[in-house]
From Swiss-Prot:
Disulphide-bonded residues: C6-C37, C15-C34, C23-C55
Entries under CDD domains matching the protein: KAZAL_PSTI
The protein, known as: Trypsin inhibitor ClTI-1
Role, per record: Inhibits trypsin and plasmin.
InterPro entries (alphabetical): Kazal_dom, Kazal_dom_sf, Prot_inh_Kazal-m
Xref: Pfam families: Kazal_1 (PF00050)
Signal peptide from the UniProt entry: none
Record keywords: Disulfide bond, Protease inhibitor, Secreted, Serine protease inhibitor
Amino acid sequence: SIPPACDKYSRLPGCPRDYSPVCGTDGKTYPNECVLCLSNSEENKNVQIYKSGMC
């Protein structure tokens, strides 16, 4: 698994709307890396990227 590059999104007010799905180590498909980072910070989790694309 690959840790998401959350640092590059930390200054943004929200996530970009581009659809570039990643599969998290929790088995969920996220629309993009930023959404995974946002979910991690909101829910105090440490989900990583299992693979690019849908799960």
